[in-house]
Amino acid sequence: NEADDPKKIFSITQRAINFIEKNNKKSKPFFLQISHYAIHSDILARGTSYKKFNSKKTGKIHDNLGLAAMTFDLDESIGLILDKLEELNLENTYLIYSSDNGSVPIITPRKYYEESYNYPLSRGKWDATEGGIRVPFIVMGPRVNKTRYSETPISFSDLLPTIIDIAGN
């Protein structure tokens, strides 16, 4: 039902879980990339998620109920994947979470850049400036220090050789 999953977050996640279960039975390493449509326009979320944020006090920049609800849905779906990995005891698994770009700098009705989702970062999505390229990059796995934080810039073009090294090839 599209009303229960307007961005296909949970149907994409269920397909990923099915893939994990199927490949776990093969007892061989596997690679899975999940590319959600969220967080992206159109801003859509489940009705229950909208209700969860409806009574929250908004801030000057963080005032978009739909964006909060959609982010909540995506976060919940990632939790389902983590739960499945734990259930199947897939301890030798690396999870990489990131985004392709920063936010659109100006979304109507915002008139000024200072009111944008990226502020105080410079510009956004289609720019090679901090607001366009500074995105979350989270890695979880057996040889990853859970308390480590780094401000070192990375490039996705360097990611494939790293994944190959992790896989032992």
Can you describe what each PLM-predicted range is?
Residues 1-2, 121:
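Catalytic-site neighborhoods of secreted/periplasmic enzymes
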Residues 34-38, 46-47, 98-101, 133, ...:
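Active-site-proximal beta-strand/loop segments in catalytic clefts of secreted hydrolases
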Residues 55, 79-86, 116-169:
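Substrate-binding rim/cap in mid-to-C-terminal beta-strand-loop elements of soluble/periplasmic
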Residues 2-6, 147-150:
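Second-shell loop/turn segments in exported
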Residues 23-32, 88-91, 113-114, 128-132:
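Extracellular/periplasmic catalytic domains that process cell-envelope and extracellular macromolecules
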Residues 35-36, 72-110, 138:
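Metal-dependent active-site segment of extracytoplasmic phospho-/sulfohydrolases and closely related
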